[in-house]
């Protein structure tokens, strides 16, 4: 069935000329039931003429080669690709033909490789494309002149007959009423570049320059397209386009040059004045003075704007303004220099290294002493730079003239000095440990006051004077007096709170003073946490703990209660090993630090009671009774240098853990070593005095693991103490 249908369709195509050498025109038979090759029952009187008229009305775009019609021009453009010799788009300059408009557009760029991308140029290109499209349509209508019978086809053929009173543009085929309008149109769109010596015009500046060199022998600057158009020539010089059968695609100015071989030379136009402001170094010109001023900064390293706080220099004033926010937001408005202050130093070229500004403003450190009227309240700038007045003391005493180095009445704290000024600290390790302890105590109180001076150690450390070895309270009081902190009040800049949280070296901000203290070790190179087994030294206690657990865990477990070969850092001195003079005895087993009695707190209930023992926080502490205080599990060095009240340091039997609180040891055993503690029968030789040693021949009691074990622990302690008394 499918083989018989093409034969029938071919029979219907016999009256019309064959297309594509006998190929089937399937598009003719896909128009619906109304348009068909065979008249249907709905159209009994439809003949060949009616069918052709309906088909021509629906398909207005015929192919100029084969006569095939299409509904849309885009389909016709795709169809024209099948004809290799028929190209619808022709170049007006060289006659090149292209099947697609995009290909012709790319070809037109070869004639104008350096065409300026101006609005007028884009409009000219668009007009040329419209002219090409119009020519293509007229060519198709002209080729199918006899076949067009519809009014739409006649409308396409009407533009071929120009009116006698119209002036056409030779480029875009535009019609104008008068010749002046056409000349104005040519000057704006097609001939923006006019020769001032003759009537030559061009659409490109290069063509006008070439014309000036060849015809007139002088290169003069052409008139821009925005200049005032010249008056149009008289109408008799321009031939009427209505008398011409075909308008010329491009005018030829050669006859004009031959007619005027020797024109009178006009005075050459003066070149436009160059920009007023020119750089004397590179020759670049500018239209405004401030452009040249900003450009001249590139040729010289001018750092005219210096920071009065840290000494950094900037090229622009707004850079300095933004930089000053770092200081003013923390210090408040800077005060004017007093009469005794030294004159400002001249700005110097900045150093790229931040280490060059380690002293933080040598001009301020070397400044003379302030006037006596200004010594009542230390300025906030000195607090920011870690500089303390050498003669101002809260207790009214004067500064020691030989206690340390002073620069003009101001003594810089050791953290503001270079590293080489602190090398003598290693010669006195004992004094350094005591000073660090005082520093840690001052941090706990200085953090609430928000003072930067509590960050630094005692100035007596840098001068070689030993710190007082009194109790904790006396040491912290002395540290506050040295740093300028009153017991009953605060300093003037203590209310600012954020003064001591900025690094004076790099300007970084930190949330707490401890983080700033750890960060300052990066600049100072200080590594206070040293390993007792090797040469490792760290800036943080956590680094040393990790190092000891990773590399020296076996050495720590086998070391026993003996002292290490080298004193550990202050953060772990009281938690890793006891003092050399401390010996584990039964009498030193105390439950609470500072308890007068050597007996552990007995339970309020009987031995068989299952109630919990009394809370450790309600026991006596420091000889004071009737107070409910929380349990203090921290370790502090007593007046005699012992860890805890009696020097008791409780060590775990199964791991290197050590603590001064028996409750914490019991909790540690319950959490980590409950099963191992139950199966343990023989204690080690260095058993901690936390649990009283049982008489010979008896099994030592297990540590308190549950609530039932608490009374047992009390009974064992009572039995041990009773045996000792007997």
UniProtKB/Swiss-Prot annotation:
It comes from the Eukaryota. Residues 473-482, 572-589 have a biased composition (Polar residues). Keywords: Activator, Differentiation, DNA-binding, Metal-binding, Nucleus, Phosphoprotein, Repeat, Repressor, Transcription, Transcription regulation, Zinc, Zinc-finger. Transmembrane segments: none annotated. The modification Phosphoserine is found at residues 16, 696, 702, 710. One of its GO terms (molecular function) is RNA polymerase II cis-regulatory region sequence-specific DNA binding. Residues 262-275, 561-571 have a biased composition (Pro residues). The modification Phosphothreonine is found at residue 699. C2H2-type zinc-finger domains 5 and 6 are important for the interaction with SOX9. Belongs to the krueppel C2H2-type zinc-finger protein family. Transcriptional regulator. Recognizes and binds 2 copies of the core DNA sequence motif 5'-GGGGG-3'. Binds to the HMGN1 promoter and may repress HMGN1 expression. Regulates SNCA expression in primary cortical neurons. Binds to the COL2A1 promoter and activates COL2A1 expression, as part of a complex with SOX9. Plays a role in chondrocyte differentiation. This is Zinc finger protein 219. It comes from Mus musculus. The gene is Znf219.
């Amino acid at each position: 069935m499918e083989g018989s249908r093409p034969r029938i369709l071919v029979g219907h195509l016999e009256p019309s000329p064959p297309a594509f050498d006998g190929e089937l025109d399937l598009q003719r038979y896909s128009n619906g039931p109304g348009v068909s090759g065979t008249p249907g029952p709905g159209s009994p009187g439809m003949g060949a003429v009616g069918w052709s008229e309906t088909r021509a009305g629906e398909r207005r775009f015929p192919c100029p080669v084969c006569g095939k019609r299409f509904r849309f021009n885009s389909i016709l453009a795709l169809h024209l690709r099948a004809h290799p010799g028929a190209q619808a788009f022709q170049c007006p300059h060289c006659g090149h033909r292209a099947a697609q408009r995009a290909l012709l557009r790319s070809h037109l760029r070869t004639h104008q490789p350096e065409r300026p991308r101006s609005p007028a140029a884009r409009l000219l290109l668009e007009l040329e494309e419209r002219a090409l499209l119009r020519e293509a349509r007229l060519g198709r209508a002209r080729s199918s002149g006899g076949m067009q019978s519809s009014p739409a086809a006649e409308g396409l053929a009407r533009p071929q007959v120009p009116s006698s009173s119209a002036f056409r543009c030779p480029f875009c085929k535009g019609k104008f009423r008068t010749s002046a309008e056409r000349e104005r149109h040519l000057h704006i769109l097609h001939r923006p570049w006019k020769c001032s010596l003759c009537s030559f015009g061009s659409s490109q500046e290069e063509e006008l320059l070439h014309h000036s060199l060849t015809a007139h022998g002088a290169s003069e600057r052409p008139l821009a397209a925005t200049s005032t158009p010249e008056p149009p020539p008289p109408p008799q010089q321009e031939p009427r386009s209505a008398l011409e059968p075909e308008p010329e695609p491009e005018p030829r100015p050669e006859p004009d040059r031959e007619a005027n071989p020797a024109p009178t030379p006009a005075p050459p136009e003066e070149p436009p004045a160059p920009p007023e402001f020119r750089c004397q170094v590179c020759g670049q010109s500018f239209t405004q003075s401030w452009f040249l001023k900003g450009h001249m900064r590139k040729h010289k390293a001018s750092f005219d704007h210096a920071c009065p706080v840290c000494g950094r220099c900037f090229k622009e004033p707004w850079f300095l303004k933004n930089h000053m926010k770092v200081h003013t937001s923390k210090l408040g408005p800077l005060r004017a220099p007093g009469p005794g202050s030294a004159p400002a130093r001249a700005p110097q070229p900045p150093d790229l290294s931040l280490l060059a500004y380690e002293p933080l403003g040598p001009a301020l450190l070397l400044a003379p002493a302030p006037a006596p009227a200004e010594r009542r309240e230390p300025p906030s700038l000195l607090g920011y730079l870690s500089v303390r007045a050498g003669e101002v003391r809260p207790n009214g005493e004067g500064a020691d003239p030989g206690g340390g180095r002073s620069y003009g009445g101001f003594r810089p704290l050791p953290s503001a000095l270079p590293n080489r000024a602190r090398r003598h600290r290693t010669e006195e390790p004992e004094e350094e440990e005591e000073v660090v302890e005082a520093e840690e105590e001052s941090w706990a109180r200085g953090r609430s006051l928000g003072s930067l001076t509590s960050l630094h150690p005692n100035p007596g450390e840098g001068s070689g004077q030993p710190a007082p070895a009194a109790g904790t309270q006396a040491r912290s009081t002395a540290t506050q007096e040295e740093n300028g902190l009153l017991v009953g009040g605060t300093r003037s800049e203590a209310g600012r709170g954020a003064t001591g949280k900025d690094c004076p070296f790099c300007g970084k901000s930190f949330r707490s003073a401890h983080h700033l203290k750890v960060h300052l070790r990066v600049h100072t190179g200080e590594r206070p946490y040293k390993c007792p087994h090797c040469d490792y030294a760290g800036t943080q206690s956590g680094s040393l703990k990790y190092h000891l657990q990773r590399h020296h865990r076996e050495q720590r477990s086998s070391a026993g209660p003996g002292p290490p070969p080298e004193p550990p850092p202050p953060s772990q001195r009281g938690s890793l090993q006891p003092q050399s003079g401390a010996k584990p005895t039964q009498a030193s087993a105390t439950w609470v630090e500072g308890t007068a009695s050597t007996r552990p707190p007995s339970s309020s209930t009987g031995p068989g009671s299952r109630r919990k023992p009394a809370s450790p926080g309600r026991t006596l502490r420091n000889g004071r009774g009737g107070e409910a205080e929380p349990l203090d599990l921290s370790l502090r060095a007593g007046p005699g240098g012992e860890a805890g009240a009696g020097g008791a340091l409780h060590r775990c039997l199964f791991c290197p853990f050590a603590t001064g609180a028996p409750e914490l040891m019991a909790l540690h055993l319950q959490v980590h070593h409950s099963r191992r503690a139950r199966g343990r029968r023989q204690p080690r030789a260095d058993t901690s005095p936390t649990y009283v040693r049982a008489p010979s021949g008896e099994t030592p009691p297990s540590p308190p693991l549950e609530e039932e074990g608490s009374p047992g622990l009390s009974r064992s302690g009572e039995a041990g103490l009773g045996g000792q008394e007997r």
